[in-house]
Amino acid sequence: MESFILQLLKPIIAFLESLTLDEQKKFAALLSVFVVSLTFLTSIFAKKKSNPIALPLDGKTAIRLPLERIVQLSKDTKLLRFTLPTKEHAFGLPTGSHVMVQLTDAKTGEKHMRPYTPVSSDALDKGHVDFVVKVYFPNKQFPEGGKVSQMLDAVKVGEDTVEFFGPLGGKRYVGEGEFTVKKLKSQGGGVERRDARDEVGMIAGGSGITPMLQIVREMLRETGAGGQSPKKISILYANKSEEDILCRDTLDNFEKQFPGRVKVWYTVDAASKKKEWKYDVGFITKEMIEKHLPTPAKSGDRFQILVCGPPPMMKFAVNPAFEKLEIGKEHVLTW
């Protein structure tokens, strides 16, 4: 190998020996300029390549995207993938915020809107954006079902487009276990910072898991890039049945890939296979929160609990439990 390298270097050495001392100095100076310039251009190219192009989401103008793919997750839940303008584009949504999805009724011309949070990541998923949609079909309690979810269920791949408005919501995950909350004018305005460097707890009910997935993915992406906070992520996820658990494979993989750091616990109204079900049964209780999530008594002050679920879950289960455990509003972020 050494002799091979010497053979390659011989013409270069001969060329340098043929130069005068002044010529050698000039050549060395030119070579150093070339190397510095090449390094600079390479770094610029690398930055451009690593930074995706964000969509111009301004909260007012609709972004129209075509449906690319449908993945059936359960009997009433789908993953919808929408195509972005190029493979280098990212959706451009800050972590923790959401968008308003708008569709037009073909028969009446009436527009219908509903908030959704993507489960894909701008940093990890270029060229597309993914949404998990639970379709609310008509039933005895709600004869019309969910209008927007049924309209999304009818969208066809390669034929239809959907309008998106955003970003919306005043809460952001800004990295390294820190959140910001936009304060209302009545509260004096400005931005409040929340410290969750030690632990983040999450309570989700049904489709309320989607904003949690977005945030967890970003936190774990930071870990891969050398981030250390938050030190622990605990998720308590409630559903009607085991079959209704959305993105369970993804959640279980988080726990497997980051043992000791990510903990996922489920509770269902009724377990179809009681002998095989190792988690809880019933509504979320004070005891579940105390056992699986951070509290002031065991976690100190640097934690936040993120909550997203139906109003009855909040009113009759979560809020009373928080009060008993003395978990104040300063430690709770609700989506």
Question: What is each PLM-predicted segment?
Answer:
Residues E2-F40, K232-W335:
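Reductase modules of NAD(P)H-dependent flavoproteins
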Residues R193-D198, S299-D301:
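Short helix-loop-beta connector
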Residues L168-D195:
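A short, basic/flexible loop-to-alpha-helix module at the beginning of a structural domain
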Residues P52-F165, N239-S241, D252, T267-A271:
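Ferredoxin-reductase
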Residues G206-P211, P310-M313:
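Gly/Ser/Thr-rich loops at beta-strand to alpha-helix junctions
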Residues E199-I203, Q304-L306:
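Conserved beta-strand elements of the Class I
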Residues P118, I209-G226:
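Histidine-anchored nucleotide/phosphate-binding helix
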Residues S37-L57:
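Transmembrane-helix exit/juxtamembrane "anchor" motif
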